Curated annotation (Swiss-Prot):
InterPro entries xrefs: aa-tRNA-synth_I_CS (IPR001412), Anticodon_Met (IPR041872), Met-tRNA-synth_bsu_C (IPR004495), Met-tRNA_ligase_1 (IPR023458), Met-tRNA_synth (IPR014758), Methionyl/Leucyl_tRNA_Synth (IPR015413), MetRS_core (IPR033911), MetRS_Zn (IPR029038)
Name of the protein in question: Methionine--tRNA ligase
Cofactor(s) listed in the protein's UniProt record: Zn(2+)
Keyword Transcription regulation: no
Binding site for Zn(2+): 146, 149, 159, 162
Assembly: Homodimer.
Protein encoded by which gene: metG
Short motif 'KMSKS' region, span: 332-336
Binding-site residues for ATP, renumbered to this chain: 335
Species assigned in the record: Vibrio cholerae serotype O1 (strain ATCC 39315 / El Tor Inaba N16961)
Gene3D superfamilies listed in its UniProt record: HUPs (3.40.50.620), Isoleucyl-tRNA Synthetase, Domain 1 (1.10.730.10), Methionyl-tRNA synthetase, Zn-domain (2.20.28.20), Nucleic acid-binding proteins (2.40.50.140)
Length: 683
């Protein structure tokens, strides 16, 4: 490691401002925070920033559903996000929003520089338009089948299954995610970033050797497939920044979202006054820039983002660190099973340090998915943190407090053992630097096993009962506490709250350099419980709470959905199909109503005398609730003339009058247009 402190700017991907933080998000933020805390522990200068990704049609539509402005909604979500991250001890130096003055200024500047340098063009394109909502459909509001791998139910910009990016018009069988309607094509002028002009630069950047091999290999696939111009504009209505000099045209959210890294840092510079924005972002910057992201957004960060920066005169990232997804109990996070756990729900039931430790224990520097096995989570935290590490302090601290007034021995009895523990610092440092946190944890727990073996062999609880062995007891416990101190120094980036409580107990700050020398002739404070084991019932309660939250949210969402319009067919579906010959048997005729009277002792029936063209018929019809008899005399209607006469209580009915409606007062007699004559056949 260089002697001079490094200057690093570190970012996490920007959470979208239309939903809550969940344990999938937390993998990235914990991974980045551990790395950042390690860098700070080694004396490097780190600026750790993030922001909410606050633009796009999804936010605009959700705000409408909630009955508030997009600005009010993203402010509310930002407060929730920051509260959750703080709950997990994510040590951001600044948390901002892409909907900010800084981001508007920088997005406009970068666009205009790209345009000036010949990297922006425009052309008329045909794009999908929702005929019901009368709006162009952004990528994420079209769903269909991926044109490459044929996976169904994929969004209109990229496929979650194979990672391919494409235009919404390339989707197979597209549907509007807003209304469910089949979109139609409509012309619109759009603006494009000429990504192919940067292919040579991007290939060189890929071959630099700093990118993860999986990322470099994926980029090579994209190069072989041919880079395409990138559509960076969207049509109104849209919540975002208008493109300078254009009417009703907005920057696509993926243009201004990564610029949000710059906007958040600019905001931090303005707050602090001792930071130089240009020192970190100029093309010749000597500082280091790192992005932690998920594997679903590699395309944007490894192709578009470095090309945009290069084309507008800014520096490119030093590296992009990509991680996989979180699964729970070997399966995709599920709301119905309660394994889709919000950060806030977790914090209501469990210590955030437990998840920080478990994620660290399973993380490596590859793009592997991480499985949060809840049974293993409970067992590993209890076995490693409680039984091996914290217990090491509790087994020794009581004797130091009670027998030696809290004073460690002036003599360190096991220099060779301590040298082994201190000597692991370089190896563990290399692993933290390389983001091989799981391997670092294994090194630390292996040392913890050795420390506990030492205490078991020395048995201070036995020595304490032996007369004249006070010095031996103090020496043993001093060694045990010092080994605990070394372990907690190594764990400080992973478990900062536990490290802080340890520092209070030791009455000394834990520093990486301090590991080199044991703590002797030093007073510690009375020992208090440093960490609580996980009760499986806490995990069960968290899962049940997640199920309940998901059910309540689904019920609320269903209630908020516009009810599909009830139609007459939905209320009274069609009867089974019949053959034409069956229908041809029915003889429908125009009939003139000669007389009409109410049938006594009947609530429904009217008695009609009908002229069907030279023949008079008596017909009873159940439309009494809808008509006054005298209003019908002289009208024309339609009758089934060849229906077999039916004897009724009040007389013989020689046909059937046709009427429409659900019943009661909602009945309407069928009447032909003027010109129809009694006896005419209805064709």
């Amino acid at each position: 490691m260089a002697n001079d402190p490094r200057k690093l700017l570190v970012t996490c991907a920007l959470p979208y401002a239309n939903g809550s933080i969940h344990l999938g998000h937390m993998l990235e933020h914990i991974q980045a925070d551990i790395w950042v805390r390690y860098q700070r522990l080694r004396g490097n200068t780190v600026n750790f920033i993030c922001a909410d990704d606050a633009h796009g049609t999804p936010i605009m539509l959700k705000a409408q559903q909630m009955g508030m402005t997009p600005e009010a909604m993203i402010e509310m979500v930002s407060e929730e996000h920051q509260r959750d991250f703080a709950g997990f001890d994510i040590s951001f130096d600044n948390y901002h929003s892409t909907h900010s003055d800084e981001n508007r200024e920088l997005a406009s500047h970068i666009y205009l520089q790209l345009k000036k340098n010949g990297f922006i063009s425009s052309r008329t394109i045909s794009q999908l338009f929702d005929p019901e909502k009368e709006m162009f459909l952004p990528d994420r509001f079209v769903k269909g089948t991926c044109p490459k791998c044929k996976s169904e139910d994929q969004y209109g910009d990229n496929c979650d299954a194979c990672g391919e990016t494409y235009s919404p018009t390339e989707l197979i069988n597209p549907k509007s995610a807003v209304s469910g309607a089949t979109p139609v094509m409509k012309d619109s002028e759009h603006f494009f970033f000429d990504l192919p002009q940067f292919e040579s630069m991007l290939k060189e950047w890929t071959r630099s050797g700093s990118l993860q091999s999986e990322t470099a290999n994926k980029m090579q696939e994209w190069f072989e497939g041919g880079l395409q111009q990138w559509d960076i504009s969207r049509d109104a209505p849209y919540f975002g920044f208008e493109i300078p000099g254009e009417k009703d045209k907005f920057f696509y959210v993926w243009l201004d979202a990564p610029i949000g890294y710059m906007g958040s840092f600019k905001n931090l510079c303005d707050k602090r006054g001792d930071l130089d924005f240009n020192e970190y972002w100029n093309k010749d910057s000597k500082t280091e820039l790192y992005h932690f992201i998920g594997k679903d957004i590699v395309y944007f960060h490894s192709l578009f983002w470095p090309a945009m920066l290069d084309g507008s005169g800014f520096r490119k990232p030093t590296n992009v660190f990509v991680h996989g997804y979180v699964t729970v109990n070997g399966a995709k996070m599920s709301k119905s099973k309660g394994t889709f756990v919000k950060a806030s729900t977790y914090l209501n039931h469990l210590d955030p340090e437990c998840l920080r430790y478990y994620y660290a224990a399973k993380l490596n520097n590859r793009i592997d998915d991480l499985d949060l096995n809840l049974e293993d989570f409970t067992q590993r935290v209890n076995a490693d943190v409680v039984n091996k590490i914290v217990n090491l302090a509790s087994r020794n601290a009581g004797f130091i407090t009670k027998r030696f007034d809290g004073k460690l021995s002036a003599h360190f009895a096991e220099p060779e053992l301590y040298a082994e523990f201190a000597g692991a610092a370089d190896r563990i440092a290399e692993l933290f630097e390389a983001r091989e946190f799981g391997r670092a944890i294994r090194e630390i727990t292996a040392l913890a096993d050795k420390a506990n073996q030492y205490v078991d062999e020395k048995a201070p609880w036995v020595v304490a009962k032996q007369e004249g062995q006070d010095q031996a007891l103090q020496d043993i416990c001093t060694v045990g506490i010092n080994l605990f101190r070394v372990l907690m120094t190594y764990l400080k980036p992973v478990m900062p709250a536990l490290a802080e409580r340890t520092e209070a107990f030791l009455n000394q700050e834990l520093t990486w350099e301090g590991v080199a020398t044991p703590l002797t002739d030093h007073a510690v404070t009375p020992f208090k419980a440093l960490f609580n084991r996980i009760d499986p019932k806490q995990v069960e309660a968290m899962i049940e709470a997640s199920k309940a939250e998901a059910a309540a949210e689904k019920a609320a969402a269903d209630a908020a959905k516009p009810k599909s319009a009830e139609t007459e067919l939905s209320k009274d579906p069609l009867a089974a199909e019949i053959e034409f010959d069956d229908f041809a048997k029915v003889d429908l005729r125009i009939a003139k109503i000669l007389s009409c009277e109410a049938v006594e002792k009947s609530d429904k029936l009217l008695k009609f005398e009908l002229d069907i063209g030279g023949e008079t018929r008596q017909v009873f019809s159940g439309i009494k609730s809808a008509y006054q008899p005298e209003d019908l005399i002289g009208k024309y209607t339609v009758v089934v003339a060849n229906l077999k006469p039916r004897k009724m209580k009040f007389g013989m009915s020689e046909g059937m009058i046709l009427a429409a409606g659900p019943g009661g007062s909602d009945l309407w007699l069928l009447e032909p247009h003027q010109g129809a004559q009694a006896g005419m056949r209805v064709m």
